[in-house]
Amino acid sequence: MKTAYIVKAYRTAVGKAPKGVFRFKRTDELAAETIQYMMNELPQLDKKRIDDVIVGNAMPEGSQGLNMARLISLMGLDIVDVPGVTVNRFCSSGIETIGIATAKIQSGMADCIIAGGAESMSSVPMTGFKPELNYDLINSGHEDYYWGMGNTAEAVANQFNVSREDQDEFAFNSHMKALKAQAENRFQDQIVPIKVDQTYVDANGKKATKSYTVNKDEGPRKGTNKEALAKLRPVFAAGGSVTAGNSSQMSDGAAFVMVMSEDMVKELNLEPIARLVNYAAAGVEPRIMGIGPVKAIPKALKQAGLKQDDISLIELNEAFASQSLAVVRELGLNQDIVNVNGGAIALGHPLGCTGAKLSVQLFDEMRKQKMQGKYGMVTMCVGTGQGAAGIFEFLN
């Protein structure tokens, strides 16, 4: 079996949706410009040698439809030779693509693949524009298959005894860690600056355009405090505990990695960043989908021949504080190594992009902490009752 390495990894900043800094930017544009930036960092790579562009997206319709990955390949590489395929496993789509790319290279089916994810929740809302439910399923007692994510977060909070106070504390800490990371410029090296053109009608009724560059995550709020979080009303259930403040933010963003065979890495004289050791997905009850990592993490560890204590750093997607805390407690995760720079409650959760985004963040933080030869993990819950986990060995 061949060895597959990740040689480059970049992401955009994450903007709030639907009225944030990227509301005037299409998803395919965000993705294409990220890939262009990455290609500029690889001048020795002939674009025609790239075998595929694999893009994760959770809501592939509207401006994200029509096999967006192929359009991203055409736009980002500016040649027709490289195909593209869009992949959807909801919130784990972005790391699912890295798993597919790695497996294809290991099997000898490819030598070089761009993998990642992109999502604009400003362009395509959660559940898409016109979901069509299977009412036979609903009428047969499976309405939880279609539960909104907030309802599942309430179910997790109730079943696993996660208090409102603990959820708000977790959310507060997420913002504090993210703000500290921003103040220390810990994200700067991983973020691709994106130019946005905003067209509007000025005071004289004339069409005008202004431009700005986005290179900083929009989500972390300096004014966040425990008192304000405690005053927020539950959003999903009367008397519930899940609020807008202890839930992830709707977001826009893109993130990509370049995966190469060992032979190509040596030929191009590149230094690999990391390798995907194992990726696993698992199923759980849809009504408590947030607990998905509790099944996915042990599965990934077992397949990799590793133990939980072998993991030095973890990026756990904070879909909700309730499910994040439930996962941490059920598995006994060391909170000192989980989301050291904050998570999705502060930094945002651009659905199909998130798995790739968290991978980029993981590599950069492991580099800063000089964790060569150690293992890191990216994990998340997934809608309709799934969990996913990817284990990486950091190299350089």
Model-assigned labels for residue ranges:
Residues 1-27, 225-291, 295, 302, ...:
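Condensing-enzyme catalytic core mediating Claisen C-C bond formation in acyl metabolism
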Residues 11-12, 24, 28-33, 44, ...:
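N-terminal extracellular/periplasmic Venus flytrap/periplasmic-binding protein-like
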Residues 23-113, 118-135, 191-214, 287-288, ...:
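Conserved beta-ketoacyl condensing-enzyme motif
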Residues 25, 57-111, 132, 144-151, ...:
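Conserved catalytic cysteine-centered active-site region
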Residues 27-43, 68-72, 97, 149-156, ...:
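Short, well-ordered amphipathic alpha-helical segments that serve as non-catalytic structural scaffolds
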Residues 88-118, 157-186, 256-263, 328, ...:
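Active-site-proximal alpha-helical scaffold in enzymes
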Residues 152, 187-190, 277-346:
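Active-site pocket-lining segment
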